[in-house]
Amino acid sequence: MSLQSIKYTRGSLEILDQLLLPVQSKYLPVRGVEDGWKVINKMQVRGAPAIAIVGCLSLAVEIHPEEFDSKKSLRQELEGKLNYLVSARPTAVNMKMAADELLSLANDLTKDDNVDVAAMKQRFLNATEAMLKKDIADNRAIGAHGAKAILQLVAAAAGAPMAGPVRVLTHCNTGSLATAGYGTALGVVRQLSELGKLEHIYCTETRPYNQGARLTAYELVHEKFPATLVLDSMVAALLRAKNVAAVVVGADRVAANGDTANKIGTYQIAVVAKHHGVPFFVAAPLTSIDLHIPSGDHIIIEERPDREMTHVGEHRIAAPGINCWNPAFDVTPASLITGIITERGVFQPAQLKETITKLLET
């Protein structure tokens, strides 16, 4: 059974505090937008899909007991709070996409004379809750498309009609803890396992916040997958020695040309995968694809505090006085990406803008 990182019923939201894992499993109440902003900014919840879900649900929890005297005042409240939530971690596009979608709904309802303020609030709550259900369904579709693509590539390379069990590498955390459930890149791994086609999954530690060691390893042990943790600096040796069939990572933002922002360290894994001829896949929902930016050069990269590099918990591990550069993400060029796995299929980066534009029109 997958881990549950988000517990929601109308008017109530709790999130699993990921800063305490794997030592302690503790759920935190999120009573409104201020709590939502804090748990996102402090990375007590992380992963682009989960950030969007928790952000939107924190707003739903806040407005649930409130009464508004007009649709205009409700719309203004929603706009201000959604914009505030987007600022918590700006690199991940999913929160911005969700905010735009909900604000568009609010604008339409404000103009609709057949909808009163109570009905408008109800429609807004329904829309946020629908996002939670859709994320899980989308993740399962991503898993199915990704597993199929990997197995087809492996079979074709071997000149065989069917691929045997495969070894896969992933980076950071993209499972149930990073989404509403099931996972994106880890959802692909989960689907391979369900098909009996997963021989082994390798996960990186993912310095400096150790999401791989703390979170992905925690999920893999929970699921009883055959899994091994490796240091970030071991990836080249791993791909050379262990017959890894594919690399699958998540994404915080994908540009129109396929350039992909993901957890720091992703870029160097893609370079090494290219050198060793290992397919490199990005698994992400359509909400992570930002067609408004032409390339990765336009993606804002969040920089995190020095302390995340210099300390582990309360213990300093770096020399006092040393300067630090701590970008949370890097951008992998589209030329290094074999395919982008979405809930609607697997696309080559060069096809992305045209294909996604057509899908969104249907």
UniProtKB/Swiss-Prot annotation:
GO terms for biological process: L-methionine salvage from methylthioadenosine. It is found in: Cytoplasm; Nucleus. Disulfide bonds: none annotated. The keyword Nucleus applies. It catalyses: 5-(methylsulfanyl)-alpha-D-ribose 1-phosphate = 5-(methylsulfanyl)-D-ribulose 1-phosphate. Gene3D superfamilies: translation initiation factor eif-2b, domain 1, Translation initiation factor eif-2b, domain 2. Pathway: Amino-acid biosynthesis; L-methionine biosynthesis via salvage pathway; L-methionine from S-methyl-5-thio-alpha-D-ribose 1-phosphate: step 1/6. The active site is at residue 252. It comes from the Eukaryota. GO terms for molecular function: S-methyl-5-thioribose-1-phosphate isomerase activity. Pfam families: IF-2B (PF01008). Its EC number is 5.3.1.23. GO terms for cellular component: cytoplasm; nucleus. The record marks 172 as: Transition state stabilizer. InterPro entries: IF-2B-related, IF-M1Pi, IF_2B-like_C, Initiation_fac_2B_a/b/d, M1Pi_N, NagB/RpiA_transferase-like. Keywords: Amino-acid biosynthesis, Cytoplasm, Isomerase, Methionine biosynthesis, Nucleus. The keyword Repressor does not apply. Transmembrane segments: none annotated. SUPFAM superfamilies: NagB/RpiA/CoA transferase-like. Belongs to the eIF-2B alpha/beta/delta subunits family. MtnA subfamily. Catalyzes the interconversion of methylthioribose-1-phosphate (MTR-1-P) into methylthioribulose-1-phosphate (MTRu-1-P). HAMAP family: Salvage_MtnA. This is Methylthioribose-1-phosphate isomerase.
